[in-house]
Regions:
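Short, ordered loop/turn segments at secondary-structure junctions
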Residues: 26, 103-105, 171-172
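Catalytic cores of RNA-modifying enzymes
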Residues: 155, 159-177
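Surface-exposed amphipathic alpha-helices with a cationic face
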Residues: 14, 59-70, 90, 128-139, ...
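A contiguous, low-structure linker/loop signature
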Residues: 88-107
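Active-site-adjacent beta->alpha loops and helix N-cap segments on the catalytic face
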Residues: 32-35, 58-59, 84, 106-136, ...
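N-terminal capping/small domains of soluble enzymes
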Residues: 1-84
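Catalytic cores of alpha/beta
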Residues: 6-15, 83-94, 147-161, 190, ...
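Hydrophobic faces of well-ordered beta-strands that scaffold small-molecule active sites
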Residues: 1, 19-24, 74-78, 98-100, ...
Length: 210
């Protein structure tokens, strides 16, 4: 996911063998929507919808995928400064997974404490727990690995303890143009949560390695 992933794109790639597809990332509340506007102004592609339209848009995208691929799970990657808008998205009828964005590294998102800066929140467990306890679908949390000052394994265990269904790891390692496979293996060995590995997956060889 680099900026935007929509139903049109996902419907093209699902036939290659994917059983889960992720839409997003979407900004849901006033602060994240404003941050997205700033990102767009400097030339990066971002989804941008008014706060009162975004849930309907996501629902339409979900339905476009389900119409062509009814057996594929659909996930929506979303960001918000508070849990409530994420819980609202989870109520979308055919959405299978709502994914909390704790991985975005755009400066405008970081400035409001979202994206990977979510990992620094003292109330992260409560935030995720609120979504897990009130969501109408499965919950995934996508994190960025190797963030300065953050113990990724500790965060992984925290997320597992909230009851989230999936841990999606952007296994980035600064200065290395490949996934941090050692860290992924360490997390998988020390947790029981379902782990989705990600980063630099651009070949069949890397898919098999991951």
């Amino acid at each position: 996911m680099a900026g935007i992933t929509d139903a049109e794109f996902l419907n093209k790639v699902i036939p290659f063998g994917f059983d889960t597809a992720t839409l997003g990332g979407y900004s849901l509340d006033a602060k994240t929507i404003e941050a997205s506007e700033k990102i767009i102004k400097r030339g990066r592609n971002e989804f941008h919808f008014p706060q009162d339209e975004i849930v309907n848009h996501i629902e339409k995208e979900v339905n476009l995928i389900k119409k062509q691929h009814p057996n594929v799970k659909v996930s929506a990657n979303v960001r918000s400064t508070t849990p409530r808008p994420i819980i609202e998205v989870s109520n979308i009828d055919k959405l299978d997974i709502v994914e909390i964005n704790c991985h975005c590294r755009q400066d405008e998102i970081l400035a409001i404490g979202c994206g990977q800066n979510m990992l620094k929140r003292d109330d992260l467990a409560e935030y995720i727990g609120d979504v897990v306890d009130n969501a109408s679908c499965e919950v995934s949390v996508k994190i960025r690995a190797n963030v300065d000052g953050i113990d990724t394994l500790k965060i992984a265990k925290l997320i597992e303890n909230t009851g989230a269904d999936y841990l999606h790891i952007d296994a980035m390692k600064v200065g290395i143009f490949d996934a941090d496979y050692d860290l992924l293996a360490k997390i998988c060995s020390n947790t029981n949560i379902k782990v989705i590995g990600n980063n630099s997956i651009d070949s069949e060889k890397k898919i098999k390695k991951m």
